[in-house]
């Protein structure tokens, strides 16, 4: 007998590839997040999203240290808590892991 998963990935989005002058990390995040939101028919991001775990390392080249709340706001998910996770090349995977742990812990 298989147990039901406690956390599931229900949608994904991706920003356009290539060199994009003047486009900041918050815009790339919003582009991917909005695509993912559009794929979930009954999702209301402002109501249904309880927290955002965002993996990125753009602080050193964008000179912006509180990226997660800004990116979440650009994607339309305020006032949910937004946490930036930084772990070099594993930032996104670690953010996903933190989100799964939050769900499994009852957040």
Predicted regions: what is each one?
Residues 1-80:
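Conserved "HGTGT" condensation-loop signature of ketosynthase/thiolase-family condensing enzymes
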């Amino acid at each position: 007998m298989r147990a039901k998963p406690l956390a599931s990935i229900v949608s994904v989005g991706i920003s356009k590839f290539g060199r994009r002058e003047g486009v900041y990390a918050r815009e790339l995040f919003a582009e991917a997040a909005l695509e993912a939101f559009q794929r979930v028919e009954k999702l209301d991001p402002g109501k249904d999203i309880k927290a955002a775990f965002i993996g990125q390392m753009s602080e050193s080249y964008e000179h912006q240290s509180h990226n997660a709340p800004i990116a979440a706001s650009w994607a339309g998910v305020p006032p949910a808590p937004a946490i930036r996770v930084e772990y070099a090349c594993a930032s996104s995977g670690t953010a996903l892991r933190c989100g799964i742990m939050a769900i499994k812990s009852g957040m």
